[in-house]
Amino acid sequence: NPDKQLEDEITKIHIENKDYGYRRVYRELRNRKIFVNKKKVQRIMQKLCFQVTSFTRKSRRYNSYKGNVGKIAPNRINRRFNTSVPHQKITTDTTEFKYYEIDNKGRMVIKKLYLDPFLDMFNGEVLSYGISKTPSAASVLSAQKQAIEITSDCPYRRTFHSDRGWAYQMGAYSSVLKENKIFQSMSRKGNCYDNSVMENFFGILKQEMYYGTTYYSFEELKDAIERYIKYYNEKRIKEKLGWMSPVEYRLNTLAA
């Protein structure tokens, strides 16, 4: 088989990146200095039965809005998500996941897990995150602290964006931003498009590691999310980033 070497390489890429369609596999091959026709890649993937199974599910979005319980910041980002400067514009939000556990009476019960990531709008990289069993101020503040430390090398004044969730209205949250001379920005009430960068990340995350899979403990789901975030940051290539992963793109930009 003259294509055996190519088939082996495509198989390797597929094992590492199960969500890649033929266009991404073609780009990953080019990144590995293997130059072949795009149609050939598509043909081999069909032959090897490497189809991408996308599970999409309309689920009710987790809503952390509890009314005006603290200070509302202006929408400084105002959908200007693009920036050529790493660590300048950061966005955050909370999303929930479900998992199953057997209680002491032997019944299967639904439990929830909450993820609080801080994401760099420059390259879509997840800079820090908190994972908890209940909506947690401590989880948000811990991830916020890490994000502030990581982005402290930014030469310009930073902006941290969020929706109007109760955690981002807390004095503890906004005062830390103030102390570090960071602008606080908030979406308009009930307008998810004002934070579409984070909505998009949540959609990709859930499609690629959550929908279609059942998790049977908090630890199992937490571990899957942590492994996915590492993969998303370091390996998952994006067309928008010149077919590089978020970390690769940042390092390339800094080296230029």
Each language-model region and where it sits:
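Mobile genetic element proteins and their domesticated derivatives, centered on retroelements
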Residues: 10, 25, 41, 45, ...
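Active-site beta-loop-alpha junctions of metal-dependent nucleic acid enzymes
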Residues: 111-112, 130-153
